[in-house]
Structures are given as C-alpha cells and as structure tokens.
A protein has these predicted regions:
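Conserved donor-binding/catalytic core segment of Leloir-type glycosyltransferases
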Residues: 190, 234-310, 316-319, 329-331
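Carbohydrate-associated surface elements
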Residues: 40, 195, 217, 229
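Short hydrophobic beta-strand element within catalytic cores of glycosyltransferases
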Residues: 425-435, 439
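Acidic donor-binding loop of glycosyltransferase active sites
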Residues: 187, 377-380, 397-411
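Nucleotide-activated donor-binding/catalytic signature segment of Leloir-type glycosyltransferases, i.e.
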Residues: 269, 273-276, 297, 326, ...
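A conserved catalytic-core segment of Leloir-type glycosyltransferases
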Residues: 35-130, 234-238, 254, 259-262, ...
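A charged, aromatic-enriched C-terminal amphipathic alpha-helix characteristic of glycosyltransferases
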Residues: 15, 458, 472-506
Length: 510
C-alpha cells in the first residue's frame, strides 16, 4: 500500500510524535511504501527512514539517502515542508530551527492562514509525487483541514489526539470551525480512546458518524521487564558513547539554581535554560544512572516533558512524604527543568516561602498550603534529561513504580502503557484517557483503584498513598503484577495492532 502521512511536528518528545514514528516504522517493516511529511530536523537518526528531502511549496528538493537506513521490505521517505520561522503548537516548548514557537490560540488570522496555506501546498505536492492509496493527517486541527483543502473531501483519515482538543478546539470558536471543516469531510476520524472521541464529538458533533477508536501501541520488543541493574548499566554504557551529552545540562548549574532561589532571581533561572541543549541527555546522566544501578531500595520514576501541564511538580511534592525510602528518577526535558531543580531544593528544605515564590515567579502549579511537610528522610532525586527510544526502555524497566500525574486531558496515556510493558507498576491521574489505561490494567489484575489516584484538591496526598500502597506489597506480589501488566500490554497495545487497525479503518470507509 502507498501511504501518505502528514504530521506537523517532530518524531520524538510528545505522544503524537512518538506514535507517528512507530506507526510509520511498522508500515515500512510490513512492506508498505510511506511518504512522511513532517518537521523532523534529524531524519538520519532513524534507521527506518530510507531517504529525505525538503518541500518548498510545490518543489521537492533532491532526495538524499539515509546512510543509517536498515533493510526492510518497505520504504519510507521523509519530506520537510519549508513553512517559515513560525511553528504553531498546542503546548509551547523549544523546537530546533524555529525562531517563533507560539500556541495556536495566540496566532493572528493572517499568521494562521499563511501556515495553513504553506502546508496545504506541501501536502498537495507530496500527494502528486507519491500517488497514495490512503492518506493520514494528524490532529483535529490543523491536519484535518489541511487534508481537505489539499486533497478534497473523503480523501484522508484524520487522527485526533488530546492536545488539539483541549488547547485549540475547546478554547476558541475559530478552531471548532476549522476542525469541523476537516473532520466532517474525513474518510474516517480515529482517536486513541473512547473518552477522547467523546470529547471530540462534544466539540465537533459532525464527527459522530465516522469515528473509530484505534489505541496507540508499545514496542514490546524493547519495552519489556528486565533486571534493574542490568537495564541501568546498559543505559549508562550507551550514554557514555553518546557524544551529544557533552552539550547537555551540567550538574554545575545546580549551584547557580540555588543562588538564584536564595536571591529570588527569576531572570537568573530563566537564563540557565539558554546555556545547554535540552534535546539531549544531561552531561552527567551516565554517571547518575550508574550510581542508581547499585541501589537496593525501590525506584519511583517519572518519564515525560518537564512542563506544568504534565504534573511533574506533583510528583516532586509527593516524594518527601513517602513512607518508603525510595530513590526518584526523573526522565525528561522541557523549559521547566531549572525551575524544577529549584522546587526540589525548596522541598528538601521545607521552605514554603520559596515554594510560594516559585509558584508566583515561575508559574509552577504548586500550593505551599497543601505541600506535605518535608520528611527527615529525603529521597535521592536523579534527573537525566531527555532519554529517547534508545534509552527509555531501560529507564522504565528500572522503575518499581512509574508516576503519571498529568494535569492535561490525555488522549490515551501512552507513557503509562510503555512503563507497564517494561514492568513498571503505574500510578496515574484518574482522568481522560489515562483513566481508561488504568481501568484496563486494574480490571486485568482484579484490583480496582490500584494503579490510579483521584486528581484535584489534595491530589498530592492521594498520590503519596497510591505509591506507598504499591511499595508496601510483598516483593513476590509486585513481581507477579509487573509481569501481569506487561503481558496485558503485549496482548492488547502493540504498534503492529495499531498500524493494522489504522489501515483497516481506511479500508472500511473507502
């Protein structure tokens, strides 16, 4: 099958980015011919990309072969549209190659139309060159409207997520109109969970007739239970060979964070973010992870972006109140990295005044009045920076408990599924698509509420109780649960199943 995919961003970092990459990889492995249109700046990092080029309006540059490409029955070519210096996003973060990264809701009308026009022209040119049998476009906006304007009604399958619904379509009527334009004309509309499709239909009722649930998946060959020490040593060994870490955040900045916190100098904390590359592992990540490999006690972890919407502050607040002596592992990247270092310091000190300042000056979603008192025992906290698909499976396999405290309405909760596949027992916020993931795992083991906590006021205490509940289980019972949740993911949530269901959705409506 000749497949065309439009995705507006990168291939790592967010759930939709990772999902796009994994699905295309599976299609290529299955013998399909895929043309992927996205903004990825480093296609050479992906062995499933055979070649790449640039789309400048309707002109395709010379296609360059990827020297790192692996053998496969199919083929994948990546084309990157030239869309200018503005990249609209749902949640602001740093994006290499773009000077102006702004939320969709902050765009002027002419900026939005310029962005849409550039992508419409690019997708139309890509379709003319590839002549696809089926086209998939990402997100309710902007992908669905780009699909309709470039290819016509009934010519594409639209994939919704969670961020498009909550950070563009819900808050602004113009995006509900734009979503309707694209979704009502789609061959099919697929979403990762029944809950995400319900929200979509609530906002855009015209999607009712052709909506289908297609859960995302996990690469169960790499995300699998492993002995902790072995997994961490392998991650450390690989990191020591990764030259990109030399540009990562150095531990020396922690002293500057402390000085800035003591001086209540917000500008100094902001400035630190410009002094390292957030898109790579931190400079001393290998040494930190190797130290963890020698620990005997439990490890409680978080993997995800370091931004307020993901709730990592809630995780840090919970750590001092745990009854169990556990090491904490924070895997991720994002603009709040140095603010989180300051928060961790304030929590260790039990300094509510500093916590209040971090809330007011840094915008951290913390409340000093509800923050648990600092315990005499302080958790060992390890930050690693970004650990991509090469490292994340080992980091997750090392976690006894994985916390997913997202504040954002998540479409599915893929990171929780990946952790479960690796044997990390999840404790997730019980809302949106995260609740569906937790409920499925809880039903499978016959333990309602075991893997979730209620969000909202007082959530930090319920999170503490949830983590302690899992850590209190006998070691043998925890091991049985680890293998149970891993087996469930392998039987129900794999990328092979996801890729097949997407093609089936297109064929059923075609």
């Amino acid at each position: 099958v000749r497949i065309l995919v439009w995705h507006g961003w990168l291939l790592e970092g967010s759930g939709s980015n990772v999902a796009t990459a994994r699905i295309v990889e599976v299609w290529r492995a299955g013998g399909h011919d895929v043309l992927l249109v996205c903004q990825e700046r480093h296609p050479e990092r992906y062995p499933w990309i055979d070649a790449w080029g640039v789309l400048d309006r309707d002109d395709v540059s010379t296609i360059e072969p990827n020297p790192n490409a692996s053998d496969a029955p199919g083929r994948c070519v990546l084309l990157r549209p030239e869309i200018g210096t503005l990249l609209p996003v749902f949640v602001v973060d740093h994006y290499e190659g773009f000077e102006d990264v702004r939320p969709f809701v902050d765009l002027a009308e002419d900026e939005l139309e310029t962005y849409l026009r550039a992508n419409v022209e690019a997708l139309r040119a890509a379709a003319a060159a590839h002549r696809p049998d089926v086209t998939f476009v990402g997100h309710g906006i902007p992908g669905a409207a780009i699909g309709r304007r470039s290819l016509g009604a009934g010519s594409y399958v639209a994939k919704i997520h969670g961020s498009d619904l909550e950070y563009a379509i819900r808050p602004q009527a113009r995006y509900r109109t734009l979503a309707r334009e694209g979704l009502e004309a789609a061959l099919a509309v697929v979403g990762p969970s029944a809950e995400s499709l319900r929200r979509c239909v609530e906002l855009v009722p015209q999607t009712t007739s052709n909506a289908r649930v297609v859960p995302p998946g996990v690469n169960v060959a790499t995300f699998r239970p492993r002995p902790r020490a072995e997994a961490l040593r392998e991650v450390a060994d690989r990191l020591e060979q990764d030259e990109s870490t030399r540009n990562g955040r150095p531990s020396a900045l922690d002293a500057e964070v402390e000085r800035a916190l003591d001086a209540r100098d917000a500008a100094a904390i902001v400035e630190l973010f410009e002094r390292y590359d957030e898109d790579v592992p931190e400079l001393e990540a290998a040494a930190r992870i190797r130290r963890l490999a020698h620990r005997d006690g439990p490890i409680v972890g978080y993997l995800g972006k370091l931004i307020p919407q993901k709730g990592v502050e809630l995780f840090l607040e919970a750590l001092p109140a745990l009854r169990h002596e556990a090491a904490a592992l924070v895997v991720g990247f994002g603009s709040d990295r140095d603010w989180l270092a300051a928060l961790a310091l304030a929590l260790r000190r039990g300094d509510r005044e500093a916590i209040a300042w971090l809330r007011d000056a840094g915008g951290l979603p913390v409340d000093p009045a509800t923050t648990p008192d600092a315990a005499a025992r302080v958790s060992d906290l390890t930050f690693t920076g970004l650990l991509d698909h090469r490292y994340a499976p080992g980091a997750l396999a090392a976690m006894d408990v994985q916390v997913v405290p997202s504040i954002l309405q998540e479409a599915f909760g893929m990171v929780a599924a990946e952790g479960a596949a690796a044997g990390a027992l999840p404790i997730v916020a019980r809302h949106s698509g995260l609740a569906e993931v937790a409920a499925a795992l809880e039903d499978d083991v016959g333990r309602p509420g075991l893997f979730s906590f209620e969000p909202g006021e007082g959530a930090v205490y319920r999170l503490v109780d949830g983590v302690d509940r899992l850590l209190s289980l006998p070691a043998r019972e925890r091991d049985e649960l680890r293998h149970a949740v891993s087996s469930f993911v392998g039987n129900h949530w794999t990328w092979e199943r996801t890729a097949a269901k997407l093609l089936a959705a297109a064929e059923a409506e075609g």
